[in-house]
Amino acid sequence: MFFIIYLIIFSTIILFIIDLILIYFPKSKLEIIPQKYKINSKEVLFEFKIINQSNNKETMVPDLDIELNGLDDGNLINLPYKKELVIDDGEMKQNLKNYWKTIIIKSNSFVKVYLKANVRDELIENKSIWLKINWSNYGHFGFIRKQNCFLLRKNNTIYKAKKLINIPGNNKNYTTIAVKTEILGIFDEPVKTISDYCKDIVKKGDYLIIGETPLAIMQGRYINPINIKYSLYSKLLCYFFHPTSSLATACGMQILINNIGITRIIYA
């Protein structure tokens, strides 16, 4: 009996130590926060911030590249374009046309980046844009690569259900209907988007449910799996969950570990 108690206490201490190591292990605290955008007939304007949330560590961005594709009815369209970047750190502006210059972002500060992309021989005003930022961070944590993707919706987007899908169920007193939408992004306001899509569908007494993933995307909480640093613990623990669960992947498990720690997961 005492052996079991000692074993539980010892295991708990070990798990706490592992949690502390994961919490304080050096990591990049740079984040990209989109601000606004504008799509003209042959031009895309996009503004974002690179924020350093560290209280005492500077971090370098040695490389940053932006890719643009047209998005029409869910299909990516190749867009030949010429881009120009302007970096504003609050003290001076740098105009970068052909390459990215390594920048240093001080602790608890940010830089603004302005993208201007001129599209060649393509009218894109009525198309959405899929914008991908491939960048790297270098600092006390080492060197890592990151990727952020944003949907820049076309100017004349009308939020209207593309398709209504009846989902069969066991309860004959209820009817379940799935509302197919356009691809959603961080610039879509959740309440307005849901209201516009469902205003002609939902009736009094209906229950309206939105999926966790599209809501997280619109709220900017979605985490690109490329940006997650996986540990051995996430790869082991994910085996103990149902195959269809997001926790059955190292990606989903690592996010849970980052949020609540291994100790709570083990004893849950």
Q: What does each model-found stretch correspond to?
A:
Residues 2-268:
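N-terminal and secondary-structure boundary signal
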